[in-house]
């Protein structure tokens, strides 16, 4: 698909930047015009939806828009990194309140909803719950029950637009005399985990009076206090820029996991516009909701509290809009729940420590939820401005919209309960989330191997995991536990995963290359070296020291592979190359030479013995139990190690070249024969890609079916499938699909890469599946953040901080690329253009900086460079290195926000 296909269908960049960040009632200029142009008219008819019939769902836009049936499954995470999350539903409702130190799908307060009251001068007032109408089914033991008042009138329809971290809902209702739109977000700033780690949901309702007469408008938000049960209370507070209800419970035990505070607030409301109820009237039946609705429906404001209060509080802002006027009301919900324990969240603990409070990092920053609200009120203009700069940079990219959509939508995983930070600031991750517990604890090495988002967007968090892996989870003999316990460092997991351990070595190399922090590498290197040498212990993966893993290899498919196979074998080759480079950088030439020898031996053997002419296969070799080193068998594979079940055999495996993919990400080049690598990728695409799965047979977990398309984990083109193959062979995982797509892109197979990404994202259309939740073993699965690697591959923007060298080689099919970059030292944008006689690169820093000694561009032959750093001319020379022209600057240059680098190369 041509890159320019993304721009014509959705012209709403204004939605990412036109709402003022100041006062709640601030005039916002042409606030809703873009929405009016792009949305359905206010007749109640839904706009065109992503949930149209399958044959019509061929294109994905960015931002992405949903309506009608496409609203059903939407749950858009609103939260910071490591804070828990609340999700915004497609109709405008808040759902899945997962802020209490564990996943909690389906959890909701009995009452949580926004309301609107509007009266045009001389007309009858209209009162509505500020959500689109509830869609079928309506069946339950009490119908839909009374919670969240499903029987109250709602708006006729809505259109949802998502470009993470911003969500926008345009509501439609012909009977409402004003137009209303919701914009919801939480600050997200690349590289700044603190600014991106705030426990708050920001809900900004934008209003416009399209009529010829003034209209009085009231907006209210009601929320039940969820801090325990008996003893809940709320107090009203006003502070600089924020008014609201601080909800707490003085009767709850200090150690209770639900002990904490919440805030329902409004930002920047002028004096006299705010009214509130600390609690609804306490009465029998549903009198509290009835009394609130009667009160608000009278005039769009709230009267004072009744003497006896129930735990539902409300806050309202009432104003008059002149004809044609626009305004915005910004609500926030903040929370503070410090008592995270391993047992409650689903993390396996060190012996006897299941109930130990490991805490939350955000709770160390703020004393309670009111402190969060105060901070946000003061800092929001800056935080939102920084967030919008990032969102604008993403949206301005000329990369295909499906690639942007996949990368940004899965970035939300870092802000769900899949990931958290303990009180000491350490970063940890489940594999995913079950409905009420984390799924598969321990920052699992073989799952987190695939994703690239953390290292590129929040590198300090990636380095936190590296420190846990190498400083606290490596045994004296080099065995790295492939899961970690909490509290971290008290106990080491008993087993190693071959792919996980080798992948961690490549990730260590990646994080060093991105940061250039050799002191940090030196601190981790002793255990890293042990972890690599562990492969060659007696009874180990490569006990005969030939660079090939023949031993018993536990891996990400939750079984042990017996004998040489490409999945673990190529990871090993990549780890050997990474080990060689790190050893050499630290002055350990002997180890570097040994690792290189093993690498050369292993690559020759794998190409000669595992490549069948089309792809790489496994040679199954049984082992006697007594020949297997301790810690290599987890017990999830076959019972007989001499005749093991659950092998891949002659499968065409989607991630058979996973280590090669990672080698491209980190700049280590080819680990295997280049032609064989490309043949294998073509074979995976030929044999495993399905445009339609209606005839696909699978008894396993089902993530794609019927007319969905997808890429199978494995196929058996030769027909030689083991009677009992490895368990997941017939499944479809987005985390593998994106990794495969990224590798296709690295190899120049652009059309195939894009088709894989588009196919995966079409499955998440809002009707069939939530576009912001790609599951595998649990919701919000970490592996799916491999979607960020597709950006990395297509951008071709590779940086080595130790060398201060940037290699720029876009892998798109256009002669001009605009995109963005993120590195530990800063982030910004870049452009690359092919000229009639040469090429041009322009690199800008939005925040931070980028130090460069040289820039490498693809091409051969003599060329003349012209280099500008801001307004300054920089001298440079050009040398050829294979297929590259390397522009060496006469001095180190630093790209900064006020100093863009422009390099023109003419031949």
PLM features: what roles do these ranges have?
Residues 14-37:
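N-terminal export signals
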Residues 93-95, 101-182, 187-193, 704-707, ...:
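Non-catalytic C-terminal accessory modules of carbohydrate-active enzymes
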Residues 115-120, 125-129, 136-145, 209, ...:
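Aromatic-rich carbohydrate-recognition surfaces in CAZymes
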């Amino acid at each position: 698909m041509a890159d320019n296909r993304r721009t014509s269908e959705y012209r709403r960049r204004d939605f990412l930047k036109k709402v003022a960040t100041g006062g709640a009632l601030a005039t916002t200029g042409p606030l809703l015009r873009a929405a009016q142009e792009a949305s359905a008219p206010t007749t109640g008819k839904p706009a065109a939806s992503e949930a149209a019939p399958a044959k019509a769902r061929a294109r994905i836009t960015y931002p992405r828009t949903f309506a009608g049936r496409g609203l059903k499954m939407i749950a858009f995470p609103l939260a910071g990194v490591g804070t828990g999350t609340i999700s915004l539903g497609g109709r405008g409702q808040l759902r899945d309140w997962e802020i209490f130190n564990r996943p909690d799908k389906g959890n909701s307060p009995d009452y949580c909803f926004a309301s609107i009251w509007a009266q045009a001068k001389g007309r009858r007032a209209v009162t509505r719950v500020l959500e689109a109408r509830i869609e079928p089914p309506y069946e339950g033991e009490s119908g839909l029950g009374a919670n969240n008042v499903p029987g109250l009138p709602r708006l006729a329809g809505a259109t949802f637009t998502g470009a993470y971290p911003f969500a926008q809902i345009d509501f439609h209702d012909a009977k409402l005399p004003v137009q209303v739109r919701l914009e919801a977000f939480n600050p997200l700033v690349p590289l700044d985990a603190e600014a991106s780690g705030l426990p708050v949901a920001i809900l900004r309702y934008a209003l416009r009076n399209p009529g010829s007469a003034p209209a009085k408008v009231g907006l209210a938000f009601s929320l039940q206090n969820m801090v325990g049960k008996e003893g809940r209370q709320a107090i009203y507070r006003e502070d600089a820029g924020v008014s609201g209800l601080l909800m707490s419970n003085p009767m709850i035990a200090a150690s209770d996991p639900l002990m904490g505070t919440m805030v329902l607030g409004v930002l920047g409301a002028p004096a006299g516009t705010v009214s509130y109820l600390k609690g609804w009237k306490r009465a029998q039946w549903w009198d509290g909701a009835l009394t609130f609705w009667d009160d608000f429906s009278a005039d769009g404001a709230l009267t004072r509290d009744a003497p006896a209060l129930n735990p539902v509080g409300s806050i309202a802002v009432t104003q008059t809009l002149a004809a044609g006027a626009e305004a915005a009301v910004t609500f926030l919900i903040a929370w503070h729940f410090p008592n995270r324990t391993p047992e409650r969240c689903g993390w396996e603990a060190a012996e006897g420590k299941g109930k130990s409070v490991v805490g939350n990092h955000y709770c160390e920053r703020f004393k309670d939820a009111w402190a969060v609200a105060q901070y946000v009120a003061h800092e929001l203009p800056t935080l939102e401005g920084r967030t919008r700069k990032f969102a604008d940079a993403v949206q301005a990219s000329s990369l295909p919209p499906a690639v942007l959509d996949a990368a940004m939508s899965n970035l939300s995983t870092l802000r769900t309960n899949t990931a958290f930070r303990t009180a000491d600031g350490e970063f940890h991750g489940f594999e995913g989330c079950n409905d009420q517990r984390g799924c598969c604890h321990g920052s699992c090495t073989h799952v987190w191997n695939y994703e690239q988002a953390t290292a590129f967007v929040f590198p300090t968090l990636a380095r936190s995991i590296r420190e846990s892996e190498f400083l606290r989870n490596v045994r004296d003999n080099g065995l790295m536990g492939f899961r970690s316990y909490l509290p971290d460092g008290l106990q080491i997991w008993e087993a190693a995963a071959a792919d996980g351990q080798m992948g961690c070595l490549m990730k260590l190399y990646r994080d060093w290359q991105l940061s250039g922090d050799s002191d940090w590498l030196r601190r981790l290197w002793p255990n890293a070296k042990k972890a690599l040498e562990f492969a060659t212990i007696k009874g180990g993966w490569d006990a005969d020291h030939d660079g090939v893993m023949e031993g018993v290899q536990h891996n990400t498919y939750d079984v042990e592979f017996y004998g040489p196979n490409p999945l673990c074998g190529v990871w090993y080759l990549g780890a050997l190359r990474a080990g060689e480079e790190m050893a050499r950088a630290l002055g350990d030439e002997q180890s570097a030479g040994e690792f290189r020898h093993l690498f050369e031996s292993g690559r020759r053997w794998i190409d000669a013995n595992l490549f069948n002419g089309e792809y790489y296969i496994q040679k199954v070799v049984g082992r006697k139990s007594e020949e297997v080193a301790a810690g290599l068998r987890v017990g999830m594979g076959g019972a007989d190690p001499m005749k093991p079940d659950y092998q891949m055999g002659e499968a065409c495996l989607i991630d058979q070249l996973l280590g090669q993919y990672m080698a491209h990400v980190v700049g280590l080049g080819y680990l295997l024969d280049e032609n064989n690598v490309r043949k294998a990728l073509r074979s995976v695409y030929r044999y495993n890609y399905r445009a339609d799965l209606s005839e696909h047979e699978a008894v396993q977990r089902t993530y794609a079916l019927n007319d969905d398309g997808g890429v199978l984990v494995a196929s058996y083109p030769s027909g030689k499938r083991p009677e009992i193959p490895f368990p997941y062979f017939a499944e479809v995982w987005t985390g593998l699909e994106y990794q495969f797509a990224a590798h296709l892109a690295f190899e120049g197979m652009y059309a195939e890469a894009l088709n894989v990404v588009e196919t995966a994202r079409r499955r998440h259309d809002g009707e069939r599946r939530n576009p912001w939740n790609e599951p595998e073993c649990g919701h919000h699965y970490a592996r799916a953040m491999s979607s960020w690697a597709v950006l990395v591959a297509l951008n071709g923007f590779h940086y080595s901080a130790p060398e201060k060298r940037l290699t720029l080689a876009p892998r798109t099919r256009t002669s001009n690329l605009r995109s963005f970059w993120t590195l530990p030292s800063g982030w910004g944008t870049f452009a690359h253009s092919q000229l009639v006689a040469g090429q041009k690169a322009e690199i800008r820093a939005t925040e931070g900086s980028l130090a460069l000694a040289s820039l490498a561009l693809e091409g051969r032959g003599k060329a003349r460079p012209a280099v500008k750093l801001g307004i300054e001319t920089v001298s440079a020379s050009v040398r050829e290195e294979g297929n590259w022209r390397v522009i060496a600057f006469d001095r180190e240059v630093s790209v900064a926000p006020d100093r863009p680098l422009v390099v023109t190369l003419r031949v």
